[in-house]
Amino acid sequence: MLSLTEIRAKAQSWLGKEYNEETRKEVREMLDKDEKKLVDAFYQDLEFGTGGLRGIMGAGTNRMNIYTLGMATQGLSNYIIQQCGNSGVKVAIAHDCRNNSRYFAETTANIFSANGFEVYLFESLRPTPELSFAIRHFKCQSGVVITASHNPPEYNGYKAYWNDGGQVVAPHDEEIITEVRKITSVNKIKFNGNKDNIKSIGKETDELFLNEVKKISINPEIIKKFASIPIVYTPIHGTGITLVPAALKMFGFKNIIGVPEQDIPDGNFPTVKSPNPEEPDALKLAIKKAVESNAELVMATDPDADRLGLAVKNRTGEFILLNGNQTAVILIWYILSQFKERKKYKGNEYIIKTIVTTDLLEKIADGFNVEYFNVLTGFKFFAELIRQYEDVKKYIGGGEESYGFLPGDYVRDKDAVASCALAAETATWAKSKGMSLFELLLDIYVKYGFYKEKLINIVRKGKEGADQIKAMMAGYRNNPPEKINNSKVIKINDYEMQVSLDILKGTKTRIDLVKSDVLQFFLADGTKISIRPSGTEPKIKFYFSVNTKLDCSDKFEETEKVLDQRISAIIDDMKLL
């Protein structure tokens, strides 16, 4: 780590004329008055990783600002020029509702245009999946979205995409990182944009995108019968407001109820602790509105509208939140069952899930004789696989436990706009059968097995914390448990070593995925435990999945208690809490 003298010298280099007055003023104040803030802003460089940039906004090398963003964009530009020259290169840019997102998007556009690229810049905030669509529609070589997903208000970020509309993957990701690291001075950034190279896009692109979304509808005639089903939707101050209500209307829904306090885009997210549809607090106002209006479904999207949270009525009429696994299960079952009912199968269809997502999706796919693939966490791996099989197989849906879902191949990133529309359609289909979405979920459990998942995060901050996380992973890897909660470990998947060990057979097979620091333990009782360090935060994640038979939906509550107790016993046995 840098000494305080080195940090001060690094900060003083930001007082030069190449930095704007606002930046110089902020740095001077830190140098004069706030040593702690100064150290945090300059002790390291904000790293351009495989997912791009994400950090707290402000002056400094460890902050999101036009200079760190500029270095990333110039490095990406240099890589694009290496790959295909700068003649005829097109790029697309979108941004979310966050503070400075528009400013950062315009700065990115200026740098791309100064490098000779034709730039398609959305006129205002838009959902991330529409950026993926724009890259594909305009035949762009690359694209960028300015967003920090559901991080706190002080954060912003920068995600880079490639010409298929997916986030960059190997070999491009590491090669772009190499180019970004070569930009060692802000003087190497071409800030002076060429306005002739920047084209504003908006409503026409929205319509083209929504037309593709509409194609995923399977039962439009059922929606006509139940068009007035009351649905509450909240964008949680984010970009979803620009397209989700329009998508629902395009599908035929006529009774979409908003949450006025949250319909206004606001990077401060004033009505919630966190704009994360996984959090009950984020849906509190929407559920209140649903109770008042006797709505049947509540939907929420995160700030860049690529993740979806649902709340449905349970058997006593109380709204409960579905987790990402449950939403994926309902949507995949609906797609597969309706493909079968309408005789749409051609025999080459497949679905995708991540390795930490519920294996109930595999059971459902097997039940419909549909192929499934497991990929590492992150939708960039979905995009990579879809591209790989583009000419021979048909992707029809896929999801991950972290609330991302993509119901078609028209874009190559998770899409909460289309997922909201599909969830609403699924609710009308269930209603046509005399069921709620919750009752449909219970029916799925009865038929395929009751799977219950839980995620716990253990936070370990700073260098000491990072060392502890490494030691924990090394401990599980080098001395794996033989039993967990009195159930034998029968298989271990080590994605870092790319090896699957079948303990019962004593055989090893290769895991054909890129290396990733993930371990999985499969137990004799059907339990799956996945362990991985977070790629973006100082924590280690433990994913637990247990399952059992559900004899009938009336036994749901008592069976759920049994599964909850099993998860608690596993956590106790592993001494995690």
Label each residue range with its predicted role.
Residues 2-108, 199-228, 239:
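An N-terminal, well-structured beta->alpha segment
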Residues 14, 18, 35-42, 46, ...:
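Gly/Ser/Thr-enriched, mixed-charge loops and adjacent short helices
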Residues 42-62, 148-149, 231, 235-247, ...:
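Conserved phosphate/anionic-ligand binding catalytic regions in large, soluble enzymes, centered on
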Residues 92-155, 254-309:
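N-terminal small/polar loop signature for handling phosphorylated ligands or for N-terminal nucleophile
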Residues 102-107, 132-136, 154-160, 181, ...:
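Short acidic, glycine/serine/threonine-rich loops at helix termini
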Residues 291, 295-297, 318, 338-339, ...:
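Phosphate-binding and adjacent anionic-ligand microenvironments
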